[in-house]
Swiss-Prot record:
It is found in: Cytoplasm. Belongs to the purine/pyrimidine phosphoribosyltransferase family. Catalyzes a salvage reaction resulting in the formation of AMP, that is energically less costly than de novo synthesis. It catalyses: AMP + diphosphate = 5-phospho-alpha-D-ribose 1-diphosphate + adenine. One of its GO terms (cellular component) is cytoplasm. It comes from Granulibacter bethesdensis (strain ATCC BAA-1260 / CGDNIH1). GO terms for biological process: adenine salvage; AMP salvage; purine ribonucleoside salvage. Its EC number is 2.4.2.7. Pfam families: Pribosyltran (PF00156). Homodimer. This is Adenine phosphoribosyltransferase.
Length: 171
């Protein structure tokens, strides 16, 4: 199945000049969603994760059901102030300004094998920050996984871990 056929392209979103690859149409098609999750499971399984870390917010949509399918745990990497209790965070640079990812203290034990999951790999900034945060708490980051990669942006080069993707947009 060609998953690109189920991903809607929206020009000029979220700002002029950007072509947004919207996975909501893929999620809405039961067959395409099943195929996507099966393919992701096959790609992630080989990294033998103990736990999957989903990046806010579309990463949650993938990581939670994928963790169930693989029989491993799931944790959330969220933006500043969204998690209850004590958190550990990491600030990272954006094109204009900074952002922050946080994880609940104790959510991952030092040495646990983690695969970080998001919907899309573009410049690699968010995934790289998530990987750095996971390393900061002592996790063994085995890989990253996404549905979409915008390979022309070379984000994979920033990750320093294997990256599993299903659909590549080269321009």
């Amino acid at each position: 199945m060609d998953l690109k056929k189920y991903i809607r392209d929206i020009p000029d979103f979220p700002k002029p000049g950007i072509l947004f690859h919207d996975i909501s149409t893929l999620l809405a098609d039961a067959d395409a969603w099943q195929v996507t999750m099966g393919r992701l499971a096959n790609r992630v399984r080989v990294h033998h994760p103990d736990i999957l870390a989903g990046v806010e917010s579309r990463g949650f949509l993938l990581a939670a059901p994928l963790a169930l399918k693989l029989g491993c745990g799931f944790v959330m990497l969220r933006k500043r102030g969204k998690l209850p209790g004590k958190t550990i965070g990491l600030d990272y640079a954006l094109e204009y300004g900074t952002d922050r990812l946080e994880i609940q203290e104790g959510a991952i034990k030092p040495g646990q094998r983690v695969v970080i999951v998001d919907d899309l790999l573009a410049t690699g900034g968010t995934l790289a920050a998530g990987i750095d945060l996971l390393h900061k708490i002592g996790a063994d980051v085995a890989a990253a996984a996404t549905i979409i990669e915008l390979s022309f942006l070379k984000g994979r080069e920033r990750l320093n871990v294997p990256c599993e993707t299903l659909v590549d947009y080269q321009d």
